């Protein structure tokens, strides 16, 4: 793959990654509710989920999703319900220690990682959209597999960098409010963002 083709794809990936969607909303929710460490774990989970999703898309899953309304809706609703459930738990679970630093402060890093890994994998639009843009950068006269690997790695890395920026910004903003009442409301807001992200996934249409 020529450098100018790769660079064009990297820039396209960055523009896509910067647009806030359900994935970014869930990362911000974790940052506001549980702090930087948990937010960064959710970023790692999203990166793994994105990598799996785009790999599946290049392996043919996009064709199934594009032609099967049932498969599309199963992925969509599974991701939506999961995020909404996590958000409601975050809103209702306010009796834990009010701190952004320990595991008791909210979600555990492992649960944030697994949650966003599922969000990445269960987001059907990621699969369909990646196929739409990657097709513009794969040359049929060159071996397919090396090009596909480069695109998957590039997209995942660029999206992870963008998500990290969102996580650090949101967690830093949340730390500006240190009173117990402020932290309670920040956590509720974080849970609300997760619920909103789930609702956003539920409204996706083919």
Language-model regions, residue ranges each:
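Juxtamembrane transmembrane-helix termini in multi-pass membrane transport proteins
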Residues: 3-73, 132-151, 155-156, 167
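Juxtamembrane cytosolic amphipathic helices that cap and anchor the N-termini
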Residues: 4, 107-112, 124
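Hydrophobic/aromatic residues within the transmembrane alpha-helices of Major Facilitator Superfamily
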Residues: 14, 18, 51-52, 88, ...
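Short, conserved phosphate/pyrophosphate- and ester-handling motifs at nucleotide-, phospho-/glycolipid
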Residues: 21, 123, 191
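Hydrophobic alpha-helical transmembrane segments in multi-pass integral membrane proteins
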Residues: 55-58, 122-127, 131, 194-206
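Selective transmembrane alpha-helices of multi-pass membrane proteins
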Residues: 67-98, 156, 162-170, 174-206
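Flexible cytoplasmic inter-helical loops of multi-pass small-molecule transporters
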Residues: 92-111
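A short amphipathic helical element positioned immediately N-terminal to and/or at the very start
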Residues: 113-121
């Amino acid at each position: 793959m020529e450098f100018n083709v790769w660079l064009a794809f990297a820039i396209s990936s960055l523009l896509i990654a910067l647009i806030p969607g359900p994935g970014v909303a869930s990362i911000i929710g974790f940052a506001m509710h549980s702090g930087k460490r948990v937010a960064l774990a959710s970023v790692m989970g999203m990166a793994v989920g994105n990598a799996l999703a785009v790999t599946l898309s290049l392996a043919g899953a996009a064709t199934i999703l594009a032609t099967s309304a049932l498969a599309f809706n199963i992925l969509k609703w599974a991701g939506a319900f999961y995020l909404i459930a996590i958000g409601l738990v975050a809103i209702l679970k306010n009796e834990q220690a009010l701190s952004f630093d320990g595991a008791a402060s909210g979600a555990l890093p492992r649960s944030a990682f697994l949650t966003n890994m599922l969000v990445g994998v269960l987001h059907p639009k990621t699969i369909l959209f990646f196929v739409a843009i990657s097709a513009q950068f794969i040359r049929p006269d060159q071996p397919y597999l090396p090009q596909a690997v480069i695109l998957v790695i590039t997209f995942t890395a660029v999206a992870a960098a963008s998500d990290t920026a969102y996580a650090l910004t949101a967690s830093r903003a949340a730390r500006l409010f240190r009173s117990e009442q402020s932290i309670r409301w920040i956590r509720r807001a974080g849970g609300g963002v997760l619920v909103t992200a789930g609702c956003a996934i539920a409204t996706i249409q083919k």
